[in-house]
């Protein structure tokens, strides 16, 4: 059976640390969607590993790792990331696999990502993408003109000529759209001739791989990238990523049935953050927001961008819980709230004097909502040295209990610092 770790807000919740802890007990770790547009750091002993595209299970020497069919891969970045972790002593090539059905991100996708953002910025509608080419790649995938891993590595007669033709055609359509941007497709073809040989040993048919793992009762951990509020269908569209970041994307991205999933862990930051543009009802453009930003070190791993910060939003989390069906939650960064006198939690939205039933799909409404806040007392004490959940200040436990009751979902872990030892386990009935 498979356990799944998903982000419940707008990303950067701290999924990597939970995955890191759970990785000690698993046989297979799989990514199901996204690309190298996410990022987190895992610390093992004194060594820090930065992950963007590769599965975190690589830090476990007994764990097999898969990039599933829903993942999009920039092959040069794949090897750069692999080399960076190998240079730190991690031997993992024989434990890393890539689905033959993954779509490929090329440099021209990244170029057009930037051009699209420039175009949108003139109308003040830029999305604030990472510029990694993820959106344009999913766009070519959806339009059925994309190039998959098997197109690159196939050794069937005529396969390489087909790859060349596909790439030339794909670049040509983008140059018609954006003008003759600086991109030498013939040089790119030469470059990918070698990359095809390098990538081929990693490539497998991921569907039987996952089926056999499930059939053999292997312990499987699936790590979602991004988060529910960035989901293409259920997020704050169009200020979203280009894949399904919820539980649905797990099944479609790996080719597994819902019945193969056991636990769904939702990772929740104790407050709310967001990177890039888009509505953010509980955002605090004041000293509270600055405090959360500075104490929480809210800067992106992938882009280095400063994150927007605000109070915990239970309207968002309720919506996220309804869609993903979390079996339990991991609250992270509780310690960032340690010095605040009082805490506000959004428990509803009002629009034109009317309380909304759920998180609205209309951004014009979302930008105008008035948050209904519940105020809870802070605990004004350092939680970073606490090693047992029972030792938390009473007001901290009341804060967690409030979240559990509102969402009707138990909290299983609470994070009070950056290290593994800072993750407190809480009994779940």
Swiss-Prot record:
It catalyses: IMP + L-aspartate + GTP = N(6)-(1,2-dicarboxyethyl)-AMP + GDP + phosphate + 2 H(+). Binds 1 Mg(2+) ion per subunit. Mg(2+) binds at residues 12, 39. Gene3D superfamilies: Adenylosuccinate Synthetase, subunit A, domain 1, Adenylosuccinate Synthetase, subunit A, domain 2, Adenylosuccinate Synthetase, subunit A, domain 3. InterPro entries: Adenylosuccin_syn_GTP-bd, Adenylosuccin_syn_Lys_AS, Adenylosuccinate_synth_dom1, Adenylosuccinate_synth_dom2, Adenylosuccinate_synth_dom3, Adenylosuccinate_synthetase, P-loop_NTPase. GO terms for cellular component: cytoplasm. Substrate binds at residues 301-307. It is found in: Cytoplasm. SUPFAM superfamilies: P-loop containing nucleoside triphosphate hydrolases (SSF52540). Pathway: Purine metabolism; AMP biosynthesis via de novo pathway; AMP from IMP: step 1/2. Homodimer. NCBIfam families: PRK01117.1, purA. Belongs to the adenylosuccinate synthetase family. This is Adenylosuccinate synthetase. It comes from Yarrowia lipolytica (strain CLIB 122 / E 150) (Yeast). The lineage of its organism: Eukaryota, Fungi, Dikarya, Ascomycota, Saccharomycotina.
